[in-house]
Regions:
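Conserved catalytic scaffold of divalent metal-dependent phosphoesterases
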Residues: 68-175
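N-terminal active-site segment of His-dependent metallophosphoesterases
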Residues: 1-74, 87
């Protein structure tokens, strides 16, 4: 069983998504059975708390973030859709890999924004990203998903604080 892992695309407005189309073409060529996106597919800079109030923050808009995420996902998935349309027309086998996506801390900015300002509840949500409509099975931020005996998560936490674990090597060499 072959897995293909896509980490941290961090799609944002103004970005060129040609690289995602190339990844999609590679997927069609190699046909891994399972594709795992490890989160932060969308960057969501409009919801970043890092540089709020700074000049560089002005002009960021939630709707533009969502649009960028959709454009990026379309770039990634278009080669698969095009391949399957040709295959269907020619009565050939279509390529239907399992698609798994763990939400990352950048997507989680949506939840944090709602928790910080309850007026946003019902106005913005993970559903705006529409990952499921693109065929992905979506897992909550920091959930560990085991696929074919391999554990996947946006990052693995350590201790009670929920901080990211250090490298595997550091974990193994802890005394």
């Amino acid at each position: 069983m072959r897995h293909f892992v896509i980490p941290d695309v961090q799609a944002k407005p103004g970005q060129d998504f040609t690289f995602l189309r190339k990844i999609g073409e590679y997927l069609v060529e190699k046909k891994p059975e399972k594709i795992i996106c490890l989160g932060d597919f969308a960057d969501m800079p409009s919801l970043s708390s890092y540089d709020v109030g700074k000049k560089a923050f002005e002009g960021r808009r939630y709707t533009k973030d969502i649009e960028a995420s959709h454009n990026a996902m379309t770039a990634l998935m278009s080669p698969l859709w095009e391949h399957n349309a040709r295959a269907k027309k020619n009565k050939e086998k279509q390529y239907r890999p399992e698609l798994h996506l763990t939400l990352g801390n950048h997507e989680q900015r949506i939840e944090r924004a709602i928790n910080s300002d309850a007026k946003l509840e019902g106005l913005i949500s993970y559903a705006d990203l529409s990952y499921e409509l693109y065929g992905w099975t979506v897992y909550p931020f920091l959930d560990v998903v085991v696929i074919d005996g391999i554990a996947y998560s946006h990052y693995f936490v350590s201790g009670l604080m929920g901080r990211p674990a250090t490298s595997a090597n550091a974990q193994l060499n802890k005394t």
